[in-house]
Amino acid sequence: MRTSTDIPAVRASGLVVRRGDRVVLDGLDAAFPPGVVTALTGANGSGKSTLLDVLAGVLRPSAGRVTGLPAGGVSFVTQAVPPGALPLTVRRTVAMGRWRGRPWWRPLGRDDRRIVDVQLERLAIDGLADRPLDELSGGQRQRALVALGLAQRAPVLLVDEPTAGVDQVSAALVVAALADEAARGVVVVHAAHDPGVIAAADRVVSLP
């Protein structure tokens, strides 16, 4: 089990991101420590999703840098997954979280399958395991994508709007799962608008 002393804080230093003529992030400095859930807040267009993209390494900033990213990699759950993008069952979708770094010819082992089962139960989608992902409601699909991210067991977990489109009961399951990840020493950062989800976070970083 990882502890918060095993994983350094992820730090953003002087981040500048431009999209065309617009400056989305302007010299942002922020730290994201392990062992706590950090919520990113701010108005639409304030740069929450952009910051997650930079932390995940999928977007290069115009200036500044991110340090402290551990060798174990980053698990990034994004909203930008259209329903038909993953023509898989829910179980196979979540199992994708166990394939990173694994040779294509090596099948998932018993421990991998156990981890997948745990995440399905954790997000209360075990009863949907054999359903195609594109047949699910938006909220069910969101829970499956969060479960995929959890299945990676990465030292850094980034989630864009983790409770988007889910009901209150499902939102509580997602929030509890994020808190559990933080409790095992993971760096957990999510962007949120929901006041209840923000209130459940340990820290809040507000973007102007």
Per-segment meaning from a language model:
Residues 132-136:
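Conserved ABC ATPase signature
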Residues 157-161:
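Catalytic Walker B motif of ABC-type/P-loop ATPase nucleotide-binding domains
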Residues 41-43:
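The feature captures the beta-strand-to-loop junction immediately N-terminal to the Walker
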